[in-house]
Each structure stands twice: as C-alpha cells, then as structure tokens.
Design a protein with these regions (language model features):
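A transmembrane-helix-recognition feature enriched in membrane-embedded lipid enzymes
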Residues: 190-212
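Short linear elements at protein peripheries
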Residues: 208-228
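A structural signal for short, hydrophobic/glycine-enriched beta-strand patches
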Residues: 2, 7, 39-191
C-alpha cells in the first residue's frame, strides 16, 4: 500500500511574504530571549562564591533528586556547599526544600541526614517537604517559613533562575552556584533552563500560589532563636 504524499511546506515566494517570515522569526527570537534577559537583569551581581557570599541567617538548598534514597551527586554538591557555609559561620540555619509527594521519596529527610553526617547539627536544619519546584520553594520560604533574606545554593545552570524567582517572591537573595562535572546531566540541565526560563517569567508575572501552601511554620525562627 502506497503512502499518500504529504505536501511540503513552501516558503513565501513574494518579497513581502519573505519579509513577513523574517520578521516573524526575529520576533520569535526576541520573545525567546526576554526571559533570560530578565533573569540576568534581576540577578545582577547577586551571584557569589562560598568565599565571598555575605553572612546571612539562612541558606536555602533546593532538591535535585535521590539515588536509591541518597542525595544524587548534584544534590550532594549543593549540600557540601551549605555545610561549608555553616562551618565558616556564613549562615546559621539551613532550609532544605524538596519533594516528599510519595512515601518512598523524601528529599528533605535525605538532605537532612546528609548534612548531619557532614557536621551540621540537626537543630540548625529546617525541612520544607513541599518544595515541588523552584517557585514553590521560594514562595514557601517567604510565606510559610518567614525567610526575608537567604543564600541560595544550586548548580550554576540553575542558580540565576532561583535567585530571580526568590527575589520576585520577596526573599532578598544571593546565589552560590556550585561547581559540577560537565556530564550528560549538566548539559541536560543547561538545555532545560532555556525552557524553564519561560515558565519562571510567567511565575514572576502571575505569581501563582504554590501547589501546597499550608499554615505558617516557625522552624526557621525557632532555630535562629535557640542559637542566641
């Protein structure tokens, strides 16, 4: 059985049609670059290293997946940076935010366990079990945990989006982008950010509620007060 031939797309033949096509392509490129431009403008000089980030009460570590119940290598790098900042006295409390939507998947508890193994007291760690994406984590840090200022910790390809969204959510933020091996996961993460930037811009404009908001929690305030 012969397959029917599908018509091939044809380029405009007239000069006016070609001009409109070029204009449409240029407009698409400009619109595609707007979210990334917005992120760069918002973050400005707010990206630092573990050595020069300002002293801040709270560090926020975003989840990045578990392997057999343990933090993935990328998440472990983030947690190592948080532990380093705590040991050096640059942060006082670590807020770990991640996915706990299933009984068999608990990012925050795995992050807590890793941090305690690396010298951060459990009393200095606060868990957010509903950080399902970056925007949710930022909004919940502000509205649920009362965080007004924070150091955000993530990989370099994600940190600008995290800082931009937390700034929009009302959390004055500095970002520490940890080093990562340029493997397939790194390249995937970088490519994913191209599309995630568009969603981030929409989140910043429309400010949707997180998937789960819930009542106010005093974990961060209690941890800071107990230290004094």
């Amino acid at each position: 059985m012969r397959r029917p031939k599908l018509p091939r797309p044809r380029l405009p033949r007239t000069r006016a049609g070609q001009r409109r096509l070029v204009q449409a392509l240029m407009a698409g490129c400009v619109l595609g670059l707007l979210p990334a431009t917005w992120m760069y403008l918002v973050t400005g000089d707010r990206l630092r290293t573990t050595a020069d980030v300002p002293r801040t009460d709270v560090a926020v570590v975003f989840g990045a997946g578990l392997w057999a119940g343990e933090p993935s290598p990328y998440l472990a790098h983030r947690l190592d940076a948080a532990a380093e900042l705590y040991r050096e006295g640059r942060v006082r409390v670590v807020l770990v935010t991640g996915d706990n939507s299933r009984k068999d998947y608990d990012e925050p508890d795995a992050m807590r366990t890793y941090l305690t193994r690396h010298g951060v007291p459990g009393s200095r760690i606060v868990s957010d079990y509903a950080g399902f994406d970056t925007w949710d984590s930022c909004v919940r840090a502000k509205k649920i945990f009362g965080v007004d200022e924070a150091v955000l910790i993530s990989q370099g390809f994600h940190i600008r989006r995290a800082v931009a969204l937390c700034q929009e959510a009302g959390v004055t933020s500095y970002g520490v982008g940890v080093d990562a091996k340029h493997d397939a996961t790194w390249y995937y993460g970088g490519a994913r950010e191209i599309f995630a930037a568009g969603k981030a811009a929409l989140d910043a404009v429309f400010e949707p509620d997180p998937r789960f908001l819930g009542p106010r929690e005093t974990g961060v305030a209690n941890a800071l007060a107990a230290e004094r």
